[in-house]
């Protein structure tokens, strides 16, 4: 493991407004993760069975996994941005919004297909 003792000597306290903005962004990621987790629980517990048995559970698990990844990646993003601000480095780009968007689109398309199939078959 690398020794971080020399890295901390170059850290500078950033403007508090940037620190608070970074924290607000982190909290927004956590709210998104909580919303995904609530959607997963609601899907599994409240939605009637769809055309394919077990489809609710699979979609619920996918949403729960997205929630866990969103929460973890939000924390990672917060740490990376904080470190960059303290060292006067450019803010790192992060692929998390793209992953989240693709995951939600896949869940949405599958859910739509299942609902349409249920409506057609009765």
From Swiss-Prot:
User: Which InterPro entries does the annotation name?
Assistant: DUF202, IM_YidH-like
The listed locations are:
Cell membrane
Q: What is its main location?
A: membrane
Asked whether the UniProt record includes Ion transport among its keywords, one would answer no
Q: Name one GO cellular component term.
A: plasma membrane
Superkingdom in the source lineage: Bacteria
- Its membrane topology, per UniProt? Multi-pass membrane protein
Keyword Nucleotide-binding assigned to the entry: answer is no
- Report the transmembrane regions from the record: 33-53, 58-78, 97-117
- Keyword annotations of the record: Cell membrane, Membrane, Transmembrane, Transmembrane helix
A Pfam cross-reference name? DUF202
Write out the similarity annotation: To E.coli YidH.
What is the official name of this protein in its record? Answer: Uncharacterized protein Mb2295
